[in-house]
Amino acid sequence: MAKRIIYNENARRALERGIDILAEAVAVTLGPKGRNVVLEKKFGAPQIVNDGVTIAKEIELEDHIENTGVALIRQAASKTNDAAGDGTTTATVLAHAIVKEGLRNVAAGANAILLKRGIDKATGFLVDRIKEHARPVEDSKSIAQVGSISAGNDDEVGQMIAEAMDKVGKEGVISLEEGKSVTTELEITEGMRFDKGYISPYFATDPERMEAIFDEPFLLLTDKKIALVQDLVPVLEQVARAGRPLVIIAEDIEKEALATLVVNRLRGVLNVAAVKAPGFGDRRKAMLEDIAILTGGQLITEDAGLKLENTKLESLGKARRITITKDSTTIVAEGNDVAVKGRVEQIRRQMEETESSYDKEKLQERLAKLSGGVAVVKVGAATETEMKDKKLRLEDAINATKAAVEEGIVPGGGTTLAHLTPELEVWANSNLKDEELTGALIVARALPAPLKRIAENAGQNGAVIAERVKEKAFNVGFNAATNEFVDMFEAGIVDPAKVTRSALQNAASIAGMVLTTECIVVDKPEPKDNAPAGAGAGGGDFDY
């Protein structure tokens, strides 16, 4: 395909036009009085969102060069989303402001490479300052504040996430599901839970609720298919003599073996239930080993030279209670703390080594299940459109609270960045010179941009508000919900330091790339052929 090549100022201006379009579409959502954006969907109802990265992903322009600008700034939003899970709109607004300021200097003849170096040094200084100003999150009140700000000033959601964090701890997983009612509910599971239920409904011990509940059961874990009942007979006899229930977790149980277990269960010979192993492939084996460590048992696998028919009672796991429904199993075990701690450390090391975000997520889930912490927020809404919007807001809120626990909190509402402007100017003037100094001052002029936009979305004069905030103490900022200047910590308007830091780093990185662009190569749009007369009108020889 033929290419179109654009140089110098023309290239940068075309990128800027694309960035302007995206930044404006995203910036309308910023702050407590930010509006929503409606996204048309090819299939189904339109989606109403208030989430920067979701809007950025939807924007595709006709002009290839402008579209390149959109793609670059979209990267700032999605990288911030990957790192901190929130702050995507802030990253977009910041990147836009740095690009705008920077392009003026490049057009006036400044050296773009030295400007970029100044921008990078300024970012390094600001990251350190954010770290110094961050306060650790100590109580659930602070967590609730972070959660409610990220969910669009919804105090109920903040409270719910704080409660979930309190129950499942730092390592725990808080997952989102679409609820069945209009209200949003929180469900907390004690113990390890996985999404596999009993193989046959005949295993249910409570016919009304269709649940199988076992107290003090033995647990047989194997990664093979159980085809012959003869393999199980020795274990079943030992368990029957011990007079305790047995739960079998295996890859699968074939009809013959399953029928025998069901008959024994119905006749009251043996209280037994069978469940398919969770996961698949290597992950299935790892999860079975997790369950074995949690219950103090052994995974019966031929890789380790262990056979089902030779299994002794000592190899079986023991749990305090196991609850099985048609689509989930919950194991509550205790007393194997040392082994579990060792396993948790091992999973943590794997998380540090892996590059894949998917693997990281799965390892985090395993970590949470071992630590005994899984909370499910069931999102409730009257319509599907509202449900999707709520789900995105809740996702941001959960990510923001986790980020706050990791690196602490700073004053929110764009306040921190605005207050750092004078600090950066003083530092840059005494440590940098020439065009590097200009690069750092570009960042200083761009820092109040998120605060200005929050004020403008609330119907105020952004530039005036930003100047007034800079004159006040570090913790004092502009509360756009009430149009007052308040102590942000006391008012509960806080941002996770990690979110502010990630937004700044990614914005500066992308802006630096745009400023140092000298040439763009894009596909040349193909001329549209005029369709021949009569085409598409339906041939006369066919009946339709």
From Swiss-Prot:
One of its GO terms (biological process) is protein refolding. Its main location: cytoplasm. ATP binds at T29, L30, G31, P32, D86, G87, T88, T89, T90, G413, N479, A480, A481, D495. Gene3D superfamilies: GroEL, GroEL-like equatorial domain, TCP-1-like chaperonin intermediate domain. Its EC number is 5.6.1.7. InterPro entries: Chaperonin_Cpn60_CS, Cpn60/GroEL, Cpn60/GroEL/TCP-1, GroEL-like_apical_dom_sf, GROEL-like_equatorial_sf, TCP-1-like_intermed_sf. GO terms for cellular component: cytoplasm. Residues 525-544 are annotated as: Disordered. It is an enzyme of class 5 (isomerase). It catalyses: ATP + H2O + a folded polypeptide = ADP + phosphate + an unfolded polypeptide. Forms a cylinder of 14 subunits composed of two heptameric rings stacked back-to-back. Interacts with the co-chaperonin GroES. Belongs to the chaperonin (HSP60) family. HAMAP family: CH60. This is Chaperonin GroEL 1. It comes from Nostoc sp. (strain PCC 7120 / SAG 25.82 / UTEX 2576).
